[in-house]
């Protein structure tokens, strides 16, 4: 929607918002700060200041727009901020890869990416009517979720509003979460942890990928 300075593309979102409002469809909006970024943002010549200014403009205007739509109840503020090994997701060379350019904005004095704190600050300031979600990908990788939990608790301790924790349920036949007792138990513990800390828990996406070719009965 705001791929580069001075350029806005609201048409698709406006059409979607008009539809859900007209039909009174309770909705959540997935428009977070994260890897889903423009080639301008991923360009290797970008400076942290340029990225901060563009992100600030984007999150401010998006939050204002969503705040005025009564059927929008939740918004993902940041997405895929931490790798499955528990590291901060950052930039990569080129502009055609899965990367998170916003980490280049810098780290604060506590070693937390500035963009994460700034995104929640802006969303809270401009979308008081919408619940704010910290969204994450991956499976049940312990190192990743430990870092996620640590970051969410840090944000709450510093006074940022975080209303929920989201997990993208991208299931695969070679990572059998549904058939793995330990993974299911960990998911249950993760949901309990969210609730114990006053957070909603959302499965923000759900799909099942079959990589086996041809697929066997076991994959199905």
Predicted feature locations:
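Substrate-binding cleft and catalytic face of glycoside hydrolase catalytic domains
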Residues: 1-140, 199, 210-214
């Amino acid at each position: 929607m705001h791929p580069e300075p001075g350029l806005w593309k609201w048409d698709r979102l406006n059409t979607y918002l008009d539809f859900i409002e007209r039909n009174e469809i309770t909705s959540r909006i997935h428009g977070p700060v994260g890897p889903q970024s423009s080639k301008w943002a991923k360009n290797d010549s970008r400076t942290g200041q340029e990225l901060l200014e563009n992100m600030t403009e984007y999150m401010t205007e998006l939050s204002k727009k969503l705040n005025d739509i009564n059927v929008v109840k939740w918004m993902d503020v940041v997405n895929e901020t931490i790798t499955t090994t528990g590291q901060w997701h950052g930039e990569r060379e080129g502009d055609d890869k899965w990367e998170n350019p916003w980490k280049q904005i810098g780290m604060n004095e506590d070693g937390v990416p500035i963009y994460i704190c700034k995104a929640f600050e802006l969303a809270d300031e401009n979308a008081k009517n919408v619940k704010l979600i910290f969204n994450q990908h991956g499976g049940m990788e312990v190192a990743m979720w430990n870092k996620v939990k640590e970051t969410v608790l840090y944000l709450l301790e510093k006074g940022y509003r975080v209303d929920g924790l989201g997990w993208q349920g991208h299931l695969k036949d070679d990572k059998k979460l549904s058939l793995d007792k330990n993974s299911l138990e960990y998911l249950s513990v993760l949901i309990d942890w969210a609730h114990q800390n006053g957070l909603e828990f959302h499965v923000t996406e759900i799909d099942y990928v079959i990589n086996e070719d041809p697929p066997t009965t076991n994959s199905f």
